[in-house]
Amino acid sequence: MWINWPCTDNSKKHLIMGGYTTFLHPGVDPNKIQGIVLNPMQQSEPSKVAIFGNACYSWNIWQSKEEAQKCWNASFKYVDHNSAIETQASAALRELSKHMINQNMDGRVTALQESVDLKDRLTSFKEALTNGTTISDEQFKDLINEFTILKNASATYRAQAGDIRIKDQIVYWLNCWDDTADAAINYLKAVKAVQDEEANDKIYWTSCF
């Protein structure tokens, strides 16, 4: 069986760092499969996350999404430094990869879910901002914390990557994470300052420094 995943030929600006259950379905009859071949991304090294999943699946077809998620969580330890022991770097790569899964394209590709734990909170924030309703301090704190985690994850992986080849192939995405996280944190701080009716000079210093 040939699977066109995690191929990015039609979307070279993306990384596809997930999608286990979308392409490797739980509970498939193993008698109907003689082998599985994947079509990798443009970047060979980060494609190993999908290759690890394919190896797990081919060895023992998972029976649930929870089992697949467990394999996905474990994959980064082996992809980063080929060990059952998690490191700060492998955990950081996994954290970033939660948000680098969907190609965000048209109907030519299968839609994948990313930022699952964050998207509802972001949507709630955006709706409140659009509607002009008060955003709680807890919401601001929660989202600033999330983007701080991502900012730190990028820095950690850049400094401690177990496999430098992966880091080198995803360096542009790490650069993007640095800029995106900084922009998001400063934007959230600025919105909070405006909502709190801070003076303009304080808003500038709050959001930029």
How does the language model describe each region?
Residues 1-209:
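Substrate-binding groove of N-acetylhexosamine-processing glycoside hydrolases
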